[in-house]
């Protein structure tokens, strides 16, 4: 199943997980040292939702991120869907 948001286009990003040792300078130590770096993925907070579309007069089942759900609450589903179609998501 795709991990891409249908409304905002958010998808997994790549980054690093750092292994750190030492005592921080805030605690009067010498400072934190990075001892290892491992590749990892940052996944978007995805969920499948049934949302009511007033223009189409039916439920739409969408796989969206939490950020997209907040956007739907703010602007309304029909505006967000129109914006997503214009951007090509």
Curated annotation (Swiss-Prot):
HAMAP family: Ribosomal_bL28 (MF_00373). The keyword Ribonucleoprotein applies. Gene3D superfamilies: Ribosomal protein L28/L24. InterPro entries: Ribosomal_bL28, Ribosomal_bL28/bL31-like_sf, Ribosomal_bL28_bact-type, Ribosomal_bL28_sf. Keywords: Ribonucleoprotein, Ribosomal protein. It holds the Pfam family Ribosomal_L28. One of its GO terms (cellular component) is ribonucleoprotein complex. GO terms for biological process: translation. This is Large ribosomal subunit protein bL28. Belongs to the bacterial ribosomal protein bL28 family. The keyword Ribosomal protein applies. One of its GO terms (molecular function) is structural constituent of ribosome. The gene is rpmB. NCBIfam families: L28. PANTHER family: 39S RIBOSOMAL PROTEIN L28, MITOCHONDRIAL, LARGE RIBOSOMAL SUBUNIT PROTEIN BL28M.
């Amino acid at each position: 199943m795709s991990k891409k948001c249908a409304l905002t286009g958010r998808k997994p990003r790549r980054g690093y997980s750092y292994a750190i040792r030492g005592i921080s300078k805030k605690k009067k130590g010498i400072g934190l040292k990075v001892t290892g770096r491992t590749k990892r993925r940052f996944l978007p907070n995805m969920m499948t939702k049934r949302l009511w579309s007033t223009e189409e007069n039916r439920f739409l089942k969408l796989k969206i991120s939490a950020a997209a759900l907040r956007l739907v609450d703010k602007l309304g589903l029909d505006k967000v869907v129109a914006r997503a179609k214009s951007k090509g998501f």
